[in-house]
Every structure is written in structure tokens, then in C-alpha cells.
């Protein structure tokens, strides 16, 4: 897919099976009508997956998943990621964009029951901590926590602090190991079974709503 803004080519993404983000800031015209266009090309290219090997399904063209337009502050969170072990140890990584000098990060972990633990600190990474008494994620009991990270600019002159951006992701506390004997989840060997599911439907192809997927 190739993205154009006001006739200007701003981004090209060489795969139809992965998400991508485009920064339109430099191509936008403030106070005017802007035209955003996406050109999709489904011709076979041996350098772009899944082509280059044998496949047993059709590769349609077009946009068949959600597209959103996000309005951001000049400084914002590009991405957040958490590594969490079954014992409760965790490490949070973040990626920011823009001028973040003087800003702080606030990380909040919340369980499905609503209990939470707060971690505040200057913009130094990674954020490392431990939660006691966590419920490990497993296949039979997929217990998920929610991590929320906020980028905050402290207020000046009596003004309150301002949240510039906020991102959330769900995760589980678990330990996974691939060794010669197989796959081990939280120290227990597990058998992994899967299937190959194609999402092509008669008369609709891939363009089906979430309720049917």
C-alpha cells in the first residue's frame, strides 16, 4: 500500500498482512481541506510475503481492516511493550516521539478485578518492578492484566499537569521456554495444536465485519 496526502507520497508499506502507522504532519495543510488516499497493489511480488513460496489461498486487493486517524500532541507515545514473568517481575519499555524533556511517565497495572499498582518516575527506561501474588497466565486460565502508560507534562505557573498521551495493552504474567523436550509454559510442558484458517467468504472475500471473523 502507498499512502498519499494532498497528492504527496508520504509512505509505502510492502506487506498486506501487517499494520503500519504514517506520520502526516509535514504533508498536512492547516485550516484547509486535506485529501488522504491509499493505493493498494495486489500484484504478485516475490520479495513481498506471502509470495515467493507455495500458498493455497487467494490474495485479494483492497482495504479490508480498520483504518483510523489519530490526532496527537507534538510529543506522544509511539508504542509500549511489557515483559512479564510468571513470578510477578516485569519490565516496561516505551518509545516516544517529539520533545519530552521535563516530562514524566506514569505506568499503571490493573487486574480484571480492578485492583491496581502505580509506578511513577522521570522519563527513564525501562520501568522495572514486581507485583506480588499475581495470577499466572495459562491456557486453561488466561488471566490478563491491563497496562496503561501516560506521558505527562508537569504544569507550570499554577497550572495542573497535562496528560499528553495514553496507551493501554493487555498482557499476562507467564514464562515460556522452547527447549529440546518441547514447549514449556510456566515450567509445565504443553502440547501445541493449531489449524490453518482462511478468512475468505463467498461473494465477500476478506471484507467481512468483526462479528463474522
Language model features by range: what are they?
Residues 1-213:
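Secreted/periplasmic carbohydrate-active enzymes, especially glycoside hydrolases
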Amino acid at each position: 500500500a502507498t499512502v498519499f496526502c494532498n497528492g504527496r507520497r508520504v509512505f509505502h508499506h510492502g506487506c498486506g498482512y501487517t499494520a503500519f502507522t504514517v506520520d502526516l504532519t509535514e504533508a498536512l495543510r492547516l485550516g484547509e481541506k486535506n485529501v488522504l488516499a491509499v493505493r493498494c497493489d495486489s500484484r504478485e511480488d516475490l520479495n513481498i510475503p506471502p509470495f515467493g513460496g507455495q500458498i493455497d489461498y487467494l490474495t485479494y486487493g483492497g482495504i479490508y481492516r480498520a483504518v483510523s486517524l489519530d490526532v496527537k500532541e507534538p510529543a506522544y507515545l509511539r508504542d509500549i511493550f511489557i515483559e512479564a514473568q510468571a513470578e510477578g517481575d516485569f519490565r516496561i519499555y516505551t518509545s516516544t516521539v517529539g520533545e519530552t524533556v521535563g516530562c514524566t511517565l506514569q505506568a499503571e497495572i490493573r487486574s480484571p478485578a480492578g485492583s491496581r499498582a502505580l509506578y511513577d518516575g522521570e522519563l527513564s527506561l525501562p520501568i522495572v518492578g514486581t507485583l506480588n501474588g499475581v495470577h499466572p497466565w495459562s491456557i486453561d486460565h488466561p488471566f490478563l492484566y491491563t497496562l496503561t502508560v501516560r506521558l505527562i507534562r508537569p504544569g507550570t505557573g499554577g497550572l495542573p499537569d497535562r496528560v499528553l498521551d495514553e496507551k493501554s495493552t493487555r498482557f499476562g504474567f507467564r514464562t515460556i521456554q522452547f527447549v529440546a523436550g518441547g514447549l514449556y509454559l510456566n515450567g509445565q510442558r504443553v502440547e501445541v495444536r493449531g489449524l490453518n484458517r482462511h478468512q475468505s467468504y463467498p461473494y465477500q472475500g476478506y471484507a467481512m465485519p468483526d462479528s463474522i471473523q
